[in-house]
């Protein structure tokens, strides 16, 4: 790798001129990782998968071919393909909760590792071999168990996972993009999300809600000639291009968008954080970002109605800002909406967008549509008085917008892949913007890392 000094021709091997130019532009503008040790591991709700306690020792369960039931032939096959670099080994990991809610790793031979914290209330490194090394050929493997909240990870080096005792049992502490001191912080990695149910239905997606890292694509082949679903994701050099766009945006509006780019100690960007993830590190940097836009929205809909198409039995509901400065919606919506903060808009799950247990169906339907309208900054456009109505060509046009989401969708090869939690809110008749594949009759789920397949 090249540090920021005049490089020799030898040092340029493996680096593009675009990357070197970006290093120079981003010097001092990017967030920089400083990986630490086990004492720097943070245990948070965001990076801990909580399962039931199964014992004080790690267990390995091997699948014996002769002992499989006949119906196991219908189990899902997982195929992992390295298109990143034929000369470089990529480590894959398959994690999740099994049908009994226990943390599990699935290895290449179909064996399952059930790690244990041993009752430790401080994180304990998982030392068992759980990585699946990928060279220039694909790895096909059975998925012998239901997997809930699953992830298929890919990394340029070894990722470190930990176990810790929790009030509910045993929890797995996963690498965190929100901790610049995480032991795995300097490694370029990414994951696809996967749920495989006891009934053998599969739901998988490529998401950029938290960050953009290694580039992933996926395909789901279905049984009984039901065809193949595919998601091609982002272009290969998306991280470099997004970071270049972030620097430009910082120059335009003065907000530290470039800080969303996370670089290693050479200045090379390895991932881009979402505004919501970045807010965990530096909550004040975008604290007032949306204030002006929200004020303008509130003033407009104090005078004229905002219509939310719930796309449900409730149909369209009319909303208006009340004298006490709360947005109130009709149709039986059980409570109003206060002005959202930047934190509320980035995450779509706090403040006026938080779902409470007693919220009725109308309120639950309004939340995602209202938050999506803010993130995409469509509320003040002509035609934006009905949400959702405008198509994707109108998104992110206002100066106040999620430029993280904008750049992602500009670089997606097919325009699909979540860039924020409610990116699946679409006007009726418009293409699905989410990066989801799903089937009740799955045969093979293929996940690619690197160059998107044709």
Per-region residue spans from a language model:
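Fungal secretory targeting signals
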Residues: 1-33
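Extracellular low-complexity, O-glycosylation-prone Ser/Thr/Pro/Gly-rich "stalks"
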Residues: 22-454
